[in-house]
Amino acid sequence: MNPNATITDEQFKAYLKKVRDMVEGPYTEWQKEIEVTNTFPEKFYQSNIDNDIYRYSLPVEYGGWGLSEKEILQVQEEFSRGPSGMRMHMHYASDLNWRILNDFGQPEIKEKYMPLFQDKTIFTNFALTEKSGGTGADLHSTAVWDEEKGKWILNGEKWLISHTDCSQFSYVICVTDPDKKGDDRLSAFFVPMDRPGFEIVPMPHMMGCRGSGHTGLKFTNVELEPELMLGKRGEGMKVAMHSLAVSRVHIATSNLGISQRMFEMSIARARDRVTFGKPIIKRQAIRVKLANMQMMIHALRCTIIDFCDDFDLDNNGEYVSEKAAICKLFS
């Protein structure tokens, strides 16, 4: 365990088992309802609160357990064994949901809002993608400084944004300096969703990930105080890319959890399926397939652990972003 953690090794191991039992038990049963409604029931959010899903990854000063990144991802591997839409929500909750504000928020905003993540008093979404501008320096949403009001005025649209049905704030990346080149054009903001001019726009259903709240967003003259800027002016792409680097490893770990469960199911099926008088697990061709599956799963787990070793030493280390990308690509 991380020496700064507030729980013991035994408590952590018990928590891993608790999470696995939770996602393979009631969460899998609830998914039948979610497949029809495309909405998470309130009992899902309450269960996450009761089982510390919104708390466990937070820094100690904000109600968390002080876990290392390796330990955080061990928890994620367990809940990734469950339904994909729920996994997506819990993956985001344990990473981008709070990490962007923690890493780049202004001190007074962090002090006000960071303690509210632990019990889902607040939740966020990450608004980068646009229909016509992709996810890079070619974005078209703008925030223009109004000298008279002393505020930024946000206009534009976002697309394919997750968790909009259960969040109160958006991390918005937009253009603040159109005359500059490349990434320097962009800045990031912590945007309250209850501001006048902030609109949620329905979009066609996305295949898979039922319940995870995908919509578009539209901003019409949304007024933002200067303290809502994340990082400095012109650092919008830095905010996005640094945050997404860690998120890439969470996606890789999601794939790891899914793969591990599928591997276990494959072994069980190979033992049960009998052809010509013997289980197919006795057949060499099936054993080779299973061995290759286990080899790839083990390699992915080792790749993720290697990233964690670097990240836990220095989360701004030279190879953190590179190794995060390797994890996601390999998965």
PLM-predicted stretches and their roles:
Residues 1-82, 92, 104-109, 116-120, ...:
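Alpha-helical interface subdomain recognition
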Residues 67, 135-138, 163-168, 182-185, ...:
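Short glycine/proline-enriched turns and hinge-like loops at secondary-structure junctions
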Residues 119-128:
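A short, Trp-centered hydrophobic/proline-enriched beta-strand micro-motif
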Residues 138-140, 144, 196-225:
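Flexible, small-/acidic-enriched active-site or ligand-binding loops
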Residues 151-200:
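A short core secondary-structure module
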Residues 215-242:
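A short, charged helix-loop
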